[in-house]
């Protein structure tokens, strides 16, 4: 629900955080930008949960992708997720993200077995779009 990661893909560093943690926590407005998808749509950069968190949801104010802008300030976790899905997720992945959001309950809905299913599916199938939550629930 809006944590950000800038970590490793397979064995190659994609990006490093450097001093970005200090910058985002001390900046007036923290903005993170990335394309909504990579590898010609095989990978969504907007996922239910990241495997490694560099920036928690408390440090992320705005997310920008090629699909749009999600202003996350003054929103609860579900509202943050909704804003990201509606405004930043690629249409190829929006329904999968909505489906994941419905799996959990409470203030911060999390379906633990399905939380990293996008990543697991990519490792197994080579395409995050093939994610089937029935395998993880």
Language model: regions and residue ranges:
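Single conserved hydrophobic/aromatic residue that forms the stacking wall/gate
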Residues: 1-5, 9
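Metallocofactor- and cofactor-centric catalytic cores in central/energy metabolism, strongly enriched
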Residues: 10-13, 21-137
